[in-house]
Amino acid sequence: RTMLKEIYPGLRKVNCKIDYTVVNFDVEQGRIIIRENPKYLSLNEMYQVANSYPKGSKDFVNVFDIAVRMYPTDAVANLNAGAVALSQKDLDAAVKFMEKADHNTAEFINNTGVYNFLNGDINRAMAAFEQAAKLGNEAALATLKQLQQILSVKMK
């Protein structure tokens, strides 16, 4: 009884001190990690890796594919995957990803404009680009200006 009350309580207590250092993210290392073990990368790190490749390249597209598989419910991952699918004119995949994205962002509305344009609905595309441009999306504004120029030339 004495040992139980006086010795064992002291033995149960364990104090540990753990020191660790988190190294800064290196894009070159990220390129390796994303192929070997992508679960160790955050979504932001994956985005940095993707942007280290030429836009639209196979590796660029692959990183966004990995990101949406690792973070399937993340709105940003789905928005980016939807944009990549649209750039490849894969409308079915784009819709699947865009359904899971935040519908209230300028980027989503811009993607909707691209989707409508690729589907041949120019009026809905223009409306979406106008709305996205009003919300500050530069890509939508540039696309809108290009479409307006093309349409004004066709009308002449």
How should each PLM-predicted stretch be described?
Residues R1-K156:
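N-terminal targeting segments with Sec-dependent signals, encompassing both cleavable signal peptides
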